[in-house]
Each structure stands twice: as structure tokens, then as C-alpha cells.
């Protein structure tokens, strides 16, 4: 019997009607939606409409911005993507750049959330655009995200970087890009054309150029681009600030938990070459052994499977360490004309607007990756001996005297053996040395040289966090709030966290709009003051109202940024004096031995008889 609600049903009409319904309800309807069809310089794109809690957004995912850097293009600067025929499907993320995958805690959410969620490939130079639906009638500010991951990992497709929430809630255009990491992005044989180094940074720059050329098509304003990133992404943002060819491609900058002057962020040309040639040797290049030139070495490296390079890249580090990474940007005299410290000190930053900040416990995340006595599966109550050994891996370049100074500064001398205090001290050593104090130093220098700077410390531990309580608020765990993930009900954040995320998104969007995180429409709320070299004001970000403080870990950063460099300089002088003294003593000893031998020889000769 025919259902009463289907009077026209016949077998001959069933299939066409079903296809028509699928077309109207599925991809066909979106294919005809003018909001989801755009034309960029490379050709046409078809995007997808996604739902956020507040409404829909348009997403254009997996847009190629460079030719695939495969085969003979491995290690070379990127080439702009050539035009394509027809309409390119941009409804799903593309491959993740080849990289190391973290297997320390298999299946654990705290590590898996940072692992690649798409297929690994060297064909990976794609970007993504989220824009309000419908597109803004007038040009809207653009936020461009650079992911972190120690320059050895990361992907723009990770769930934590989902741009739909920020684009919908704040009406901004959000862009993210993949860039090459590890040896593929940062292996360098300085002076060679085959592997010049810093090609991962050049990938980012090419994506920024793509934004300038195309973002207006999506409703974005190419004259109001804010570059933001976290950890190695923040260091990358800083390097673009310091590299003149990049400076004209964006207008404001946000550096979250990273800075270009961090001790892990760059290497010199000599160390870069040492690491490159060591990796080559580890994978059997050049085939004839030592003595080959750069061209032969790179030609050989290009024949090696990508996974071979990944499997060996950690073996090139000069010593056991935490918060050090194998292939990072090189001070090449080109992208970086000098060290970041020198460029920061010499730069003119008048008119620049910068937002910088850190989280409460920057060091804790890294301790489970090599500091003695630390694990996510226990309380990590370490002994004094483990703390002393931890300082050597936490500050791997330190001389004996410098390491003693670190121990002296971070020991609670009323409780020098207390395991909980030692655990906290070890976290502070790694966090202050690598993140907090480089960020504070950068903020002070930029402010002193004309930039308008805002600074924060993020202090809220998410209710959903899977890492143990002793780790506090770890590195990277402000990102989910900046991107608005607590707005998604299925993720089970609290109501207070949803409000907090909305507040943070508003701060970041306000900064992208005006260069000031404060909301001019609501002057009654606590104001976020600029950071100056004198007052050093910053704010704490947590569930409570904004709190203004002064001096971001000022005592610790005076140690790292002022005292320790002077100590190292003095000990370098002492070491050189000792070397010269030993050399002189050796020459004097040799002379005395020679003199004694001559004297003994003379003494054994027959003496003249008395006349």
C-alpha cells in the first residue's frame, strides 16, 4: 500500500527524485551557492558551508599556494602555484607536511591532539580560509595563523586550530597555512643554492603574499592583516617582523609563548652546516663518503625516503637537552641579516602594534620529554640530584659555572631538598629560560623603540585538560580559548569557560581591528594598559576580571637577560686567560726542560784542566 504522504511515488520516478533531493540537500546546493564559489589568481575555488554555534561560516580548505616541494624541489624555496583549470574543490583539508610523530604516550589526548590528523606528504603547501557567511559587505580585518611545533611538527588542520568559531563570533577572516618543518623546511648548507635554509619561513612568506593578493575576494582587508602564532609559530612571527621583505605583508603581530630571540629558535651557519652534514652521514650521503661537495650531498639527500630523514633528525643535536630542536631557522645573512637579538636591538619599531604573552607554567610540558625523574603518570617529585642533572639538560649550553648560577638562583635554600619545590623550580628553569624571559626581553625592547605593546599571562587551567595537575597551565593550552573551542557544546567546557573564550576572542579581534585589545564600546570593563619599558604593565587572563600587574617574572628575567650573559662573558674572558696562561706555561715548561737537558749535557762534558 502506498504511503499517504507519497501520492506520486512510482518505481520509475524514484531514482530521479532521490538524486534531485540529494543534489538539493547536499553538495549540489552548495555548488550553486555564490558565497561558496570564489575566483583567486590561480583559478576558481569551491568551498563549504560549516556551522558554528552562532551560525554558519564559509570555509575554503586545502587551497594550494605553492608548487609541491617534492623531488628536485626538496630543500628549495617555494614556487608560487601555477593556475589550475576548472573549479578546484576546497571543501577538505589536504596533506600535512612530513614530520616526526609523537609516540611517547600512545592514545593519550594530551599528545595526540598535536599529532598530524591527515596523511603525511611532502606535497603539503596548502592554506585555509574561514570567512563569515555571507561574506562581509565591507573589507574586514584578517588574522593569519602560524602553528607551533618546535619547527619539527605541526599542521594547520588540527582541531585546536579550527577557525570557524573565531570567524563567526567576531566577523573576521581567518587564514592558516602549512609550512615545511624539520629537515624539509630548515636543513641548511649556508652559501649553497641547493639547500639555503629557512625555506619553511619562505613558505610562510609566500602564504602571506597570497593573502595580500587574494584575501579581498573572501571579504578580507589586505591592508589590515594581523599575523599571530604560538611557540615556534610566535618565533616565526617575530622573524617576519625582523625581515624587511616580510614586514610589508602584515600590519600587526601577536606572539604567544615564543620569541625569535629564544635560545632554541635559531642557529648559526656553522652549527646549521654541522647538523646538515651529520644527517647526511646518518642516512648514507653522499654515497662515496666524506669529501663530496654540497651539490652531491643534496642530490643524495633528495633520493632518500622522507621517513629516513625524519627517523634520524633527532640524532644531530649536539647534546642531551629539552626544548631544543634539530632543524630550526639559521642566521643566514639573507632572511635574517643578523642574530634576532642584534636585529631587535637595532630595529626601528615606531608605529608597530604587538601583543605578546605567556602561560603560567611554560616549562612543565617539556619536562616529561627528557628531564630526569619526570613523567605524566606520577607526581614527578624529584630528588636534588635529579634537579641538578635536569639543569644540565634544561640549559644545555651552560658552562659549569653558569649551571651553578642557575642552581643557586632557583633553589629554595630554606627547603633545598623538598621534591615539590624542586619540581616547580625545574619547570621554572625551562619556562623562564626558553619562553618567559625572551618574551619579556622582546616586549621591553620593542616598547623602548617605539612599538605599542600589550602583554599578558594566561593563568586558567582548562577543565578538560588531560595532563596531570602538577603541570599547571602548560605550554600551548591557551590556544583552544583563543580559537573559541569552548563554544562547541559537545566539547564539555563549563559555562564560565565559554564566557572566558568569548572574552579572549574579543581581545584578539579588537587588536586585529585597531591595534588595541580593549573594547571602545564597553569602557566600563577593566582596561588593558600598554606595556612600557618603565612600568612593565601586563594583565592576567583567567576566569576573573582583568587584573593589571607589573614586571613579568622580573627577578627571574633579570637573572637570564642581564646577569647570566655578563657571567658568561666574564667566564669566557677567564677561560681565554686560562687558555693563554696554560699555553705560556707549557712553552715555559718546554723551555725549562730544554734548558735542563742542555745543562745536563754540558755538565757531563770534560771540564778544562786548571792552568
UniProtKB/Swiss-Prot annotation:
It comes from the Eukaryota. Disulfide bonds join 97-124, 285-300, 437-557. The keyword Lipoprotein applies. It is a peripheral membrane protein. GO terms for biological process: acetylcholine catabolic process; choline metabolic process. The active site is at residues 231, 362, 475. Residues 1-31 form the signal peptide. InterPro entries: AB_hydrolase_fold, AChE-related_enzymes, AChE_tetra, CarbesteraseB, Carboxylesterase_B_AS, Carboxylesterase_B_CS, Cholinesterase. This is Acetylcholinesterase. Keywords: Cell membrane, Disulfide bond, Glycoprotein, GPI-anchor, Hydrolase, Lipoprotein, Membrane, Neurotransmitter degradation, Secreted, Serine esterase, Signal, Synapse. It catalyses: acetylcholine + H2O = choline + acetate + H(+). CDD domains: Esterase_lipase (cd00312). Glycans are attached at residues 293, 378, 492. It comes from Felis catus. Pfam families: AChE_tetra, COesterase. One of its GO terms (molecular function) is acetylcholinesterase activity. PANTHER family: ACETYLCHOLINESTERASE. SUPFAM superfamilies: alpha/beta-Hydrolases. Terminates signal transduction at the neuromuscular junction by rapid hydrolysis of the acetylcholine released into the synaptic cleft. GO terms for cellular component: extracellular space; plasma membrane; side of membrane; synapse. It is an enzyme of class 3 (hydrolase). It is found in: Synapse; Secreted; Cell membrane.
Amino acid at each position: 500500500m502506498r504511503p499517504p504522504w507519497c501520492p506520486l511515488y512510482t518505481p520509475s520516478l524514484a531514482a530521479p527524485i532521490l538524486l534531485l533531493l540529494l543534489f538539493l540537500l547536499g553538495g549540489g546546493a552548495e555548488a550553486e551557492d555564490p558565497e561558496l564559489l570564489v575566483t583567486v589568481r590561480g583559478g576558481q575555488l569551491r568551498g563549504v558551508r560549516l556551522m558554528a554555534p552562532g551560525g554558519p561560516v564559509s570555509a575554503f580548505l586545502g587551497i594550494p599556494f605553492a608548487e609541491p616541494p617534492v623531488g628536485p624541489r626538496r630543500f628549495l624555496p617555494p614556487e608560487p602555484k601555477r593556475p589550475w583549470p576548472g573549479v578546484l574543490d576546497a571543501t577538505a583539508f589536504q596533506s600535512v607536511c612530513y614530520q616526526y610523530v609523537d609516540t611517547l604516550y600512545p592514545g593519550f589526548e594530551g599528545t595526540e591532539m598535536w599529532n598530524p590528523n591527515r596523511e603525511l606528504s611532502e606535497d603539503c603547501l596548502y592554506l585555509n580560509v574561514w570567512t563569515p557567511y555571507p561574506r562581509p559587505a565591507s573589507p574586514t580585518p584578517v588574522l593569519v595563523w602560524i602553528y607551533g611545533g618546535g619547527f619539527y611538527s605541526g599542521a594547520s588542520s588540527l582541531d585546536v586550530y579550527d577557525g570557524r568559531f573565531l570567524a563567526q563570533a567576531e566577523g573576521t577572516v581567518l587564514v592558516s597555512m602549512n609550512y615545511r618543518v624539520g629537515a624539509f623546511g630548515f636543513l641548511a648548507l649556508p652559501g649553497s643554492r641547493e639547500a639555503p635554509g629557512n625555506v619553511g619561513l619562505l613558505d610562510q612568506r609566500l602564504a602571506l603574499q597570497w593573502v595580500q593578493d587574494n584575501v579581498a575576494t573572501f571579504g578580507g582587508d589586505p591592508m589590515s592583516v594581523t599575523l599571530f602564532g604560538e611557540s615556534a609559530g610566535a618565533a616565526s612571527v617575530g622573524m617576519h617582523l625582523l625581515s624587511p621583505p616580510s614586514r610589508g605583508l602584515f600590519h600587526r603581530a601577536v606572539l604567544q609563548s615564543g620569541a625569535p630571540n629564544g635560545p632554541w629558535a635559531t642557529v648559526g651557519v656553522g652549527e646549521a652546516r654541522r647538523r646538515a652534514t651529520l644527517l647526511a652521514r646518518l642516512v648514507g650521503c653522499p654515497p662515496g663518503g666524506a669529501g663530496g661537495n654540497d651539490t652531491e650531498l643534496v642530490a643524495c639527500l633528495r633520493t632518500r625516503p622522507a621517513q629516513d630523514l625524519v627517523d634520524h633528525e633527532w640524532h644531530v643535536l649536539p647534546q642531551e637537552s629539552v626544548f631544543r630542536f634539530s632543524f630550526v631557522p639559521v642566521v643566514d645573512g639573507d632572511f635574517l641579516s643578523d642574530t634576532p637579538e642584534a636585529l631587535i636591538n637595532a630595529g626601528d619599531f615606531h608605529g608597530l602594534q604587538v601583543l605578546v604573552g605567556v602561560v603560567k607554567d611554560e616549562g612543565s610540558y617539556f619536562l616529561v620529554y627528557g628531564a630526569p625523574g619526570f613523567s605524566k603518570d606520577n607526581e614527578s617529585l624529584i630528588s636534588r640530584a635529579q634537579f641538578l642533572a635536569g639543569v644540565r639538560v634544561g640549559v644545555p649550553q651552560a658552562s659549569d659555572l653558569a649551571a651553578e648560577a642557575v642552581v643557586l638562583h632557583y633553589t629554595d635554600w630554606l627547603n633545598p631538598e623538598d621534591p615539590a619545590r624542586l619540581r616547580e623550580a625545574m619547570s621554572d628553569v625551562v619556562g623562564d629560560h626558553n619562553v618567559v624571559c625572551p618574551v619579556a626581553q622582546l616586549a621591553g625592547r620593542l616598547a623602548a623603540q617605539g612599538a605599542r605593546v600589550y602583554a599578558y599571562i594566561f593563568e586558567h587551567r582548562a577543565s578538560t585538560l588531560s595532563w596531570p595537575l602538577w603541570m599547571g597551565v602548560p605550554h600551548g593550552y591557551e590556544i583552544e580559548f583563543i580559537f573559541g573551542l569552548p563554544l562547541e557544546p559537545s566539547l564539555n567546557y563549563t559555562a564560565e569557560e565559554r564566557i572566558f573564550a568569548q572574552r579572549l576572542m574579543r581581545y584578539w579581534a579588537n587588536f586585529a581591528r585597531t591595534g588595541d585589545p580593549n573594547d571602545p564600546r564597553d569602557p566600563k570593563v577593566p582596561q588593558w594598559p600598554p606595556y612600557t619599558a618603565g612600568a612593565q604593565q601586563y594583565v592576567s587572563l583567567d576566569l576573573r576580571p582583568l587584573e593589571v600587574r607589573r614586571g613579568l617574572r622580573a627577578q627571574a628575567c633579570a637573572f637570564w637577560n642581564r646577569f647570566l650573559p655578563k657571567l658568561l662573558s666574564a667566564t669566557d674572558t677567564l677561560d681565554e686567560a686560562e687558555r693563554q696562561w696554560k699555553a705560556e706555561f707549557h712553552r715555559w715548561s718546554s723551555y725549562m726542560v730544554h734548558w735542563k737537558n742542555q745543562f745536563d749535557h754540558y755538565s757531563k762534558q770534560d771540564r778544562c784542566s786548571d792552568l
